[in-house]
């Protein structure tokens, strides 16, 4: 009717003992994986309290040392920004690929260029002027890379032809020259158009002035055309009558007396 009674003590702490739990056959029914009484083969012979033991000391710098290093770096950066400290830039040397590229740009082989055949930065004369850097060299200088500015020296000496020292124009230089010439031609065309417009405006103004002067001056009197009616007999009679009426009355009386 009732199940089998299990072993163990249901009393207080004074009646409980861990050794009895370890030796009990039915401990898995009421006890989990406890550190005091490990159950199963995975817990036997293992250090189950490894996390509670002290760890090995760290070999890296402590937090205080790291904070002190950060503060020092910030102080140096602030002094450099304010100008109280000179920033020393470490020059980066040319790599082999950069050296080969520069030699190709100048048109010579890197093996032919020895140390004896190269001029240093201070060996150029004062009249030689500054070295014209290409676009790639300028970009490299902006990034902080060292620019190769040496020039090849011929064995003939300083009396070499200037044409030999000149570099061949590259495609980029040609493109820049073409763009500049195109801009100049555009500007010239604009100037010509402006001049043509000004000249045209002047001509129009002169024509307007002439037309105004002609309209303001009195037109010459045209000869009056004789109408066909002037030669008609009716017109002649009217004319004679007007002439007779315009005479003096004394003349009219004389005419009448003569008629009588």
From Swiss-Prot:
Residues 106-116, 170-182 have a biased composition (Basic and acidic residues). It comes from the Eukaryota. The keyword Transmembrane does not apply. Residues 1-21, 106-133, 148-260 are annotated as: Disordered. The modification Phosphoserine is found at residues 123, 127, 215-216, 219. Residues 117-132 have a biased composition (Low complexity). Residues 1-11 have a biased composition (Gly residues). Transmembrane segments: none annotated. There is a cross-link at residues 22, 104, 113 (Glycyl lysine isopeptide (Lys-Gly) (interchain with G-Cter in SUMO2)). Keywords: Isopeptide bond, Phosphoprotein, Ubl conjugation. Residues 183-206 have a biased composition (Basic residues). The keyword Nucleotide-binding does not apply. Pfam families: MMtag. This is Multiple myeloma tumor-associated protein 2 homolog.
């Amino acid at each position: 009717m009732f199940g089998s009674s299990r072993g163990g003590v249901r009393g207080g702490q004074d009646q409980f003992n861990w050794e009895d739990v370890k030796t009990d056959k039915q401990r898995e029914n009421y006890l989990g994986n406890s550190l005091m009484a490990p159950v199963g083969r995975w817990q036997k012979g293992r250090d189950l309290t490894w996390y509670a033991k002290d760890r090995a000391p760290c070999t890296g710098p402590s937090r205080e040392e790291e904070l002190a290093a950060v503060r020092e770096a910030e102080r140096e950066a602030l002094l450099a920004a304010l100008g109280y400290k000179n920033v020393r830039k470490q020059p980066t040397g040319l790599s082999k690929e950069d050296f080969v590229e520069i030699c190709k740009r100048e048109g010579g082989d890197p093996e032919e260029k020895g140390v004896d055949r190269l001029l240093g930065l201070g060996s150029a004369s004062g009249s030689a002027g500054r070295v014209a850097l290409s676009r790639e060299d300028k970009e490299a200088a902006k990034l902080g890379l060292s620019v190769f500015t040496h020039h090849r020296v011929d064995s003939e000496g300083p009396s070499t032809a200037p044409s030999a020292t000149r570099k061949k124009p590259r495609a980029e230089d040609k493109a820049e020259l073409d763009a500049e010439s195109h801009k100049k031609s555009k500007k010239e065309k604009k100037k010509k158009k402006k001049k043509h417009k000004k000249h045209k405006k002047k001509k129009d103004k002169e024509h307007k002035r002439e037309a105004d002067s002609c309209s303001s001056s009195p037109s010459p009197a045209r000869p009056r055309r004789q109408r066909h009616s002037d030669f008609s007999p009716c017109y002649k009679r009217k004319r004679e009558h007007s002439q007779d009426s315009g005479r003096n009355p004394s003349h009219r009386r004389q005419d009448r007396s003569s008629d009588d």
